[in-house]
C-alpha cells in the first residue's frame, strides 16, 4: 500500500484529529480529555498521488502505571514498525520535558521524522511556537489539524 507513517506525541496534542484529517474521514475517536486512544489505529490514505498507511498512537506520558506502560509499549511498536514518523506537539501549551523525551526517543529510533506543531491557530500558540523549534528537528511545520491551517505545506513534505 505504501510507507507506514506513525503519528506520535503527548496525550491530547491532536494525533487522532491529524489522523482523521489526513485520511479524510472521522475514523479515530476524538475527545477533549487525554487517554482516549489506547491501541494503534491504522488506515490507508492517498496524499498527492502517493499511498501511505498511517498509524494513530496513544499519548506518551511519564506515568509508570501499568496501563500507561501498555500504551507506551504499543506506541514503541508503532515507532519500530514505521518507515517514517510524525512528531506532533501542541503549541497551545508550553514545551515541556516530555516533548524533549519524545524527541529523544524518535531521534534514537534512527527513523526519519518531522515535527508538526499543532493548534497554531490558538492565541496561546503565538507565545509558544518558537520554543518548539529548540527541539532541533530539521523539518518542522505549523498546522491546525482542526481547521486545516498549514496542511497543504505539511502534506507536500510527506
Whereabouts are the PLM-identified features?
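Conserved G1/Walker A P-loop phosphate-binding module
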Residues: 1-81, 89-92, 131
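Conserved nucleotide-binding/hydrolysis micro-motifs of P-loop NTPases
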Residues: 35-36, 59-61, 92-94, 120-124, ...
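Conserved strand-to-helix beginnings and helix N-cap segments that scaffold or border functional pockets
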Residues: 68, 96-100, 126-129
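Well-ordered alpha-helical segments embedded in enzymatic catalytic cores
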Residues: 70-77, 98-102, 153
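Conserved beta-strand segments of the P-loop GTPase G domain that flank and frequently precede/overlap
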Residues: 86-90, 116-118
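Amphipathic helical hotspot of TIR/SEFIR-family domains
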Residues: 91-111
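Canonical P-loop GTPase G-domain recognition
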Residues: 111-114, 119-158
Amino acid at each position: 500500500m505504501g510507507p507506514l507513517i506513525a503519528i506520535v506525541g503527548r496525550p491530547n496534542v491532536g494525533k487522532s484529529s491529524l489522523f482523521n484529517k489526513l485520511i479524510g474521514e472521522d475514523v479515530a475517536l476524538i475527545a477533549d480529555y487525554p487517554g482516549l486512544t489506547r491501541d494503534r489505529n491504522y488506515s490507508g490514505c492517498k496524499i498527492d498521488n502517493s499511498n501511505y498507511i498511517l498509524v494513530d498512537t496513544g499519548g506518551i506520558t511519564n506515568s509508570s502505571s501499568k496501563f500507561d506502560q501498555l500504551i507506551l509499549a504499543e506506541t514503541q511498536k508503532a515507532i519500530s514498525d514505521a518507515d517514517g514518523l510524525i512528531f506532533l506537539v501542541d503549541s497551545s501549551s508550553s514545551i515541556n520535558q516530555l516533548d524533549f523525551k519524545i524527541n529523544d526517543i524518535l531521534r534514537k529510533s534512527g527513523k526519519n521524522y518531522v515535527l508538526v506543531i499543532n493548534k497554531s491557530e490558538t492565541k496561546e500558540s503565538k507565545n509558544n511556537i518558537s520554543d518548539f523549534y529548540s527541539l532541533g528537528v530539521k523539518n518542522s511545520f505549523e498546522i491546525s489539524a482542526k481547521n486545516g491551517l498549514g496542511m497543504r505545506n505539511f502534506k507536500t513534505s510527506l
